[in-house]
């Protein structure tokens, strides 16, 4: 019962923080990047449906991350937050036969909004940009690192509270599964940001095939990882 109350309190804190970030982005609303904003909104929503179940953890991972990071790097705070909100909402919709979990969706959307909002503010921080002008990629690396922490720590915390597992052990497991993906997406975002200056807002379309390939690879890898414990148990049972 105690862990249930703590989980409810934590979800409420994350949800309120997410709404505060969304409200703050509205107050700072600037001119919209119409075509770029709409294209990233649609592409990230489509990519959100390409998701894989994380083995051993109650969660999934989709290939929408680079498009959210691109929005954070190139668009306004409001636009980046909306892209993250829609993307996380679409990702939380279960596949056919599944049951929609509104509380889980609220938590996932709020976490993604917070992560995208903080990353966007870092990327557009004048002091950080001027202090790192000799290393142009440093703000992006810092923003992606913070995005990773803000996105994964709350997930690990809520799993720990609901399942009674050790927080650091869960977070370590999530990091082991997702950190290489975040690292790759940081590189992809850097490349696409540079390409956008040359070919325009259509640049993110170029990485759709790459993300599809990454999705297929992770799906295959995670399916094997999920089957390994069951196979080991079967071998152990056969040896007895």
For the regions a protein language model found, what residue spans apply to each?
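Short helix-perturbing small/polar motifs within transmembrane alpha-helices
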Residues: 1-60, 66-173, 177-219
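Membrane-proximal helical linkers
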Residues: 165-170, 222-240
């Amino acid at each position: 019962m105690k862990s249930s109350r703590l989980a409810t309190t934590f979800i409420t804190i994350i949800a309120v923080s997410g709404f505060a970030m969304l409200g703050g982005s509205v107050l700072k609303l600037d001119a919209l990047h119409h075509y770029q904003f709409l294209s990233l909104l649609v592409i990230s929503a489509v990519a959100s449906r390409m998701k894989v179940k994380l083995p051993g953890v109650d969660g999934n991972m989709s290939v929408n991350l680079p498009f959210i990071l691109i929005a954070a790097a190139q668009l306004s705070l409001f636009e980046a937050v909306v892209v993250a909100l829609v993307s996380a909402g679409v990702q939380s919709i279960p596949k056919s036969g599944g049951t929609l979990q509104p509380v889980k969706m609220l938590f996932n959307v709020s976490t993604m909004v917070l992560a995208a909002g903080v990353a966007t503010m870092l990327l557009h921080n004048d002091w950080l940009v001027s202090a790192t002008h000799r290393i142009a990629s440093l703000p992006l690396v810092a923003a992606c690192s913070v995005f990773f922490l803000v996105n994964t720590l709350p997930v690990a915390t809520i799993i720990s509270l609901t399942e009674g597992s050790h927080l650091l052990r869960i977070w370590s497991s999530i990091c082991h599964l997702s950190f290489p993906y975040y690292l790759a997406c940081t590189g992809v975002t850097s490349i696409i940001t540079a390409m956008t200056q040359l070919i325009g807002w259509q640049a993110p379309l170029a990485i759709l095939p790459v993300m599809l390939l990454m999705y297929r690879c992770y799906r295959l890898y995670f399916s094997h990882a999920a089957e390994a414990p069951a196979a080991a148990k079967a071998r152990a049972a056969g040896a007895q």
